[in-house]
A protein has these predicted regions:
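Multi-pass membrane proteins that catalyze or facilitate reactions on polyprenyl-/lipid-phosphate substrates
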Residues: 1-293
Length: 293
């Protein structure tokens, strides 16, 4: 059961199809032998495996530290001009990948709307709106949006085709779309990818920035859950968490590679139709179950 949840997390966290919608169905058919509190904690913490997959796959684009040797002659000249330069040069030699630092600042800027708007209301929204009706409607609505956005996108060329071209203003706008994902069933990756396409990025840039944006957001969510839950676990709970994280990691690697290969030749319409069908199935199943008692 834990392996199944790890597989679902690894797939649905990165494909724009809503992990919540799938987890509702899994929870209906696969009963987990754990407390409600630990299950909620587990479903958040296994996201660490998904985050680690992004870090591993995109290490070269994300890691801002590297050693660049400055010629000795130039180093001596700078050191003679300024006594402080000798100390500063040590830092410059090791930590000088400006483009990657700028990318991280863009990621942090994109996180601002979530921190200011979504985070304070997250528990309230989860309590009031985490039900099959809201999830099903969100699945269908965002499925329709994907189709409409792709139809609109056919008539124009993207203005941002690389992460280097992504401005701070555009990053912030994508961050605003991420706020929408606080509603269960929307999909964090789905809302930010739609946002990225609407503000003029290519599909590849929208997807990659979505992956990178997930690192601080999902890590923060996992850390917050850990603090709330406490740091005391039974050996069985530790094994459950480790298994879920490891499975989510390997499946996420496959899912990310698949998505990036897929969008080079195709648009997101297939995911839109999938969401619509899934939303109808979720709504139909639970209405039928409640009607039949």
């Amino acid at each position: 059961k834990v392996v199944i949840l790890g597989i679902i997390e690894g797939i649905t966290e990165w494909l724009p199809i809503s992990s919540t919608g799938h987890m509702i169905l899994v929870d209906e058919f696969i009963k987990m032998d754990m407390t409600t509190e630990f299950k909620d904690f587990f479903l958040v913490v296994i996201q660490l495996g998904a985050i680690l997959a992004v870090v591993v796959l995109y290490w070269g684009k994300l890691w801002p530290f590297y050693i660049r040797q400055i010629p000795k002659k130039k180093k001596a000249q700078l050191a003679r001009k300024n006594p402080v330069a000798r100390i500063a040069l040590t830092f410059v030699e090791k930590f000088c990948d400006k483009d990657k630092w700028i990318l991280w600042f863009k990621i942090l800027v994109a996180c601002i709307p979530t921190i200011v708007i979504a985070l304070p209301f997250n528990d309230f929204i989860e309590e009031k709106f985490n039900n099959y009706v809201v999830v099903a409607i969100a699945l269908i609505v965002y499925g329709v949006l994907f189709i409409l956005v792709e139809n609109y996108n056919k008539r124009r060329k993207p203005t941002c085709t690389s992460l280097e071209d992504l401005s701070f203003a555009t990053a912030f706008k994508i961050g605003i779309f991420q706020v929408l994902s606080v509603v269960p069933g929307t999909s964090r990756s789905g809302s930010t990818i739609i946002g990225g396409i609407l503000v003029g990025t290519s599909r590849t840039v929208a997807a990659e920035f979505t992956f990178f944006l997930a690192i601080p957001v999902m890590f923060g969510a996992s850390l917050l859950k850990l603090v709330k839950f406490g740091f005391t676990f039974t050996p069985a709970e530790i094994l459950t968490l480790v298994t879920g994280v490891v499975v989510a990691f390997f499946v996420s690697v496959i899912a990310i590679k698949f998505l990036m290969g897929y969008i080079k030749k195709h648009d997101f319409k297939a995911f839109g139709w999938y969401r619509i069908v899934l939303g109808i199935l979720v709504l139909g199943y639970f209405i039928g179950r409640n009607f039949l008692g």
